[in-house]
């Protein structure tokens, strides 16, 4: 894995991330393919919208279809028919989401499988082994996603456990012979001091890239931005920086301004299935009756397949009748919008005009 930083504009960064299965231009947005598929999208669709990299989920793929199936295909790329780069989350967030169904110990996490009720045990070593079989281009360490809200003592204990797991993840990754990139994850909740301690510990271990985790878990937007502004400047300048699970287009523009390079979020695909379309002037909610006779495309400035061929009225009709095509067309549009956004951001940074772009973007989407 190799990261090249080409240009900065303020704190915003323009780079190139060279991975085993291809090159990712940064800043980049990664569509989420939890089970090895971005919902309603084929790999060919993802290429058309210019997605450079997709995200898969270690936890869910481990449970279903299981490692035996994926290993028989030689890894996740061939299994899902995608020949570009893949980043896999370690499973820490999904285990966190199980709540009372899981028990955390120093060794790892014991939980009941949401698929069949079997007792499962996931450790840093097992997470690294799974991701080695998946052959993901970027592997995430196994960590504990700190719940929100939580007091400083509880968050501190969680962060320290994640650091110990980070060291075990690094060791297992290296001893297993995995040559793909391994990213550390900064935790520490809403406490700047704990975030600093987490980052210092990760830097001592040493990783190929660094992520900010534990945000977008229910905290107020102001707290998310406060922690981002505090943590991002301390991340190594020569390594890729990944903000996990964030977010809206406005969140991404704001995070790029703080120096972040990589993003993932389910919002564009989930909202598409619910009839919410992102446009240059804000969000369209297709179920609203105001679109019943609207012959305009969803976004008159958009050149995606959906906007070139279909009206808001037709998309409204598909949403109202529950047609599967509606979810597909909406997803095509939203992911195209996100990829176009990232392309515009990259161009603005290259031209030294990112601040002006960000101001114009925020003004336009707020109007």
From Swiss-Prot:
It catalyses: 7-aminomethyl-7-carbaguanine + guanosine(34) in tRNA = 7-aminomethyl-7-carbaguanosine(34) in tRNA + guanine. Its cofactor is Zn(2+). Pfam families: TGT. GO terms for biological process: queuosine biosynthetic process; tRNA wobble guanine modification; tRNA-guanine transglycosylation. Binds 1 zinc ion per subunit. InterPro entries: ArchSynthase1/Queuine_TRR (IPR050076), TGT (IPR004803), TGT-like_sf (IPR036511), tRNA_ribo_trans-like (IPR002616). Zn(2+) binds at residues 302, 304, 307, 333. Substrate binds at residues 89-93, 143, 187, 214. The active site is at 89 (proton acceptor), 264 (nucleophile). Disulfide bonds: none annotated. One of its GO terms (molecular function) is metal ion binding. Keywords: Glycosyltransferase, Metal-binding, Queuosine biosynthesis, Transferase, tRNA processing, Zinc. It is an enzyme of class 2 (transferase). Residues 245-251, 269-273 are annotated as: RNA binding. GO terms for cellular component: cytosol. Pathway: tRNA modification; tRNA-queuosine biosynthesis. Catalyzes the base-exchange of a guanine (G) residue with the queuine precursor 7-aminomethyl-7-deazaguanine (PreQ1) at position 34 (anticodon wobble position) in tRNAs with GU(N) anticodons (tRNA-Asp, -Asn, -His and -Tyr). Catalysis occurs through a double-displacement mechanism. The nucleophile active site attacks the C1' of nucleotide 34 to detach the guanine base from the RNA, forming a covalent enzyme-RNA intermediate. The proton acceptor active site deprotonates the incoming PreQ1, allowing a nucleophilic attack on the C1' of the ribose to form the product. Belongs to the queuine tRNA-ribosyltransferase family. Homodimer. Within each dimer, one monomer is responsible for RNA recognition and catalysis, while the other monomer binds to the replacement base PreQ1. This is Queuine tRNA-ribosyltransferase. It comes from Nitrosospira multiformis (strain ATCC 25196 / NCIMB 11849 / C 71). The lineage of its organism: Bacteria, Pseudomonadati, Pseudomonadota, Betaproteobacteria, Nitrosomonadales.
């Amino acid at each position: 894995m190799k990261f090249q930083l080409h240009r900065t504009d303020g704190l915003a960064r323009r780079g190139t991330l060279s991975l085993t299965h291809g090159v990712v231009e940064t800043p980049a947005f990664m569509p989420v393919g939890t089970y090895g598929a971005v919902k309603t999208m084929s790999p060919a669709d993802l290429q058309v919208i210019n997605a450079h990299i997709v995200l898969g989920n270690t936890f869910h793929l481990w449970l279903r279809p299981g490692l035996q199936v994926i290993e028989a295909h030689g890894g996740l790329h061939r299994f899902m028919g995608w020949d570009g780069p893949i980043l896999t989350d370690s499973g820490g967030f999904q285990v966190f989401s199980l709540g009372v169904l899981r028990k955390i110990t120093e060794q790892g996490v014991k939980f009941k499988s949401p698929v069949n009720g079997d007792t499962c045990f996931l450790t840093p070593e097992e997470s690294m082994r799974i991701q080695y079989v998946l052959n993901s281009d970027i592997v995430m360490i196994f960590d504990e996603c700190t719940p929100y809200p939580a007091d400083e003592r509880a968050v501190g204990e969680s962060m320290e456990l994640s650091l110990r797991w980070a060291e075990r993840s690094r060791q297992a990754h290296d001893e297993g012979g995995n040559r793909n990139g391994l990213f550390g994850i900064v935790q520490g909740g809403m406490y700047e001091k704990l975030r600093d301690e987490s980052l210092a510990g990760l830097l001592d271990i040493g990783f190929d890239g660094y992520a900010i985790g534990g945000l977008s878990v229910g905290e107020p937007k102001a707290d998310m931005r406060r922690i981002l502004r505090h943590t991002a400047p301390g991340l190594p300048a020569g390594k890729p920086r990944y903000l996990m699970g964030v977010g809206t287009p406005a969140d991404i523009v704001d995070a790029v301004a703080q120096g972040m390079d990589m993003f993932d979020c389910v919002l564009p695909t989930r909202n598409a299935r619910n009839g919410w379309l992102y446009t240059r002037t804000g969000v369209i909610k297709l179920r609203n009756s105001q679109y019943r006779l609207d012959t305009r495309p969803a976004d008159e400035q958009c050149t995606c397949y959906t906007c070139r061929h279909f009206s808001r009225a037709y998309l409204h009709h598909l949403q109202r009748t529950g047609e599967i095509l509606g979810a597909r067309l909406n997803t095509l549009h939203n992911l195209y919008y996100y990829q176009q956004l990232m392309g515009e951001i990259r161009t603005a940074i290259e031209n030294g005009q990112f601040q002006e772009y960000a101001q114009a973007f925020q003004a336009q989407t707020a109007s």
